[in-house]
């Protein structure tokens, strides 16, 4: 069985998220939901965003958008997974306060235009997986 891409992500083996997952790293049926979420989020290219719902759909659970948020919220401190590339279905950052600003700054650093209120133009920046 393949070593989970997600586990390698957290060990720092896949620092370059700008490339999609190689063919041999495709998700396995046995992968847990969090593992599938990690793999999908890792594949979002720099300068693009996707929605919690899109990630859930790609993970095989189209009604699990909130669970995607929960998986990302529980990432360990210092995780290199690009969690900041996931926004709500309206193209808005769902976080508030300092967390909103942290996500906004990370996206701005990648060239994604984000309004002061956390709004992103999904037509321009949405990842077309």
Curated annotation (Swiss-Prot):
One of its GO terms (molecular function) is catalytic activity. Keywords: DNA damage, DNA-binding. Transmembrane segments: none annotated. Signal peptide: none annotated. The keyword DNA damage applies. GO terms for biological process: DNA repair. Changing residue 83 to C: Does not confer alkyltransferase activity. The record marks 66 as: Arg finger, required for nucleotide flipping. The keyword GTP-binding does not apply. It holds the Pfam family DNA_binding_1. Does not have alkyltransferase activity. A tryptophan residue replaces the cysteine at the known active site of MGMT. Involved in DNA damage recognition. Binds DNA containing O(6)-methylguanine and larger O(6)-alkylguanine adducts, and to double-stranded DNA that contains an AP (apurinic/apyrimidinic) site. Binds to the damaged base and flips the base out of the DNA duplex into an extrahelical conformation, which allows processing by repair proteins. Works in partnership with the nucleotide excision repair (NER) pathway to enhance the repair of the O(6)-alkylguanine adducts larger than the methyl adduct. This is DNA base-flipping protein. It comes from Escherichia coli (strain K12).
